[in-house]
């Protein structure tokens, strides 16, 4: 799955257009992209259900709410944050926290993570 990193919302939009034109239908828009929430909202409006969009580098429950409200269907976080998993699940979306050690993976799984991303 492509992880979108860009220097601006405009650059991010251009990258998504290129990926979609190439047949990619699932992508993660990271919160490191300036205007990431607005970009998610614009992409959801433009592409509707043609793209499965998620938010990445999400580190707190406020970002979970903002990105899901903007159209994210899944939430990826760089580490296991219980409140991120809980809020994502509460809102009915897929939670994918990052973890590295076996203990972190098991802890995330037991907390309700749908998937665990081995990271870094």
Where are these regions (language model features)?
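Conserved anion-binding
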Residues: 35, 50, 59-120
């Amino acid at each position: 799955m492509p992880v979108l990193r860009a220097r601006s919302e405009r650059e991010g939009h251009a990258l998504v257009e290129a990926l979609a034109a190439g047949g990619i239908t699932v992508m993660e828009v990271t919160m490191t992209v300036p205007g990431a929430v607005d970009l998610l909202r614009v992409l959801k409006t433009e592409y509707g259900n043609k793209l499965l969009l998620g938010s990445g580098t999400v580190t707190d429950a406020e970002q979970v709410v903002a990105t899901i409200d903007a159209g994210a269907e899944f939430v990826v976080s760089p580490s296991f944050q219980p409140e991120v998993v809980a809020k994502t699940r509460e809102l009915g979306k897929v939670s994918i926290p990052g973890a590295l050690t076996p203990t972190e993976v098991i802890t995330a799984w037991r907390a309700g993570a749908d998937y665990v991303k081995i990271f870094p």
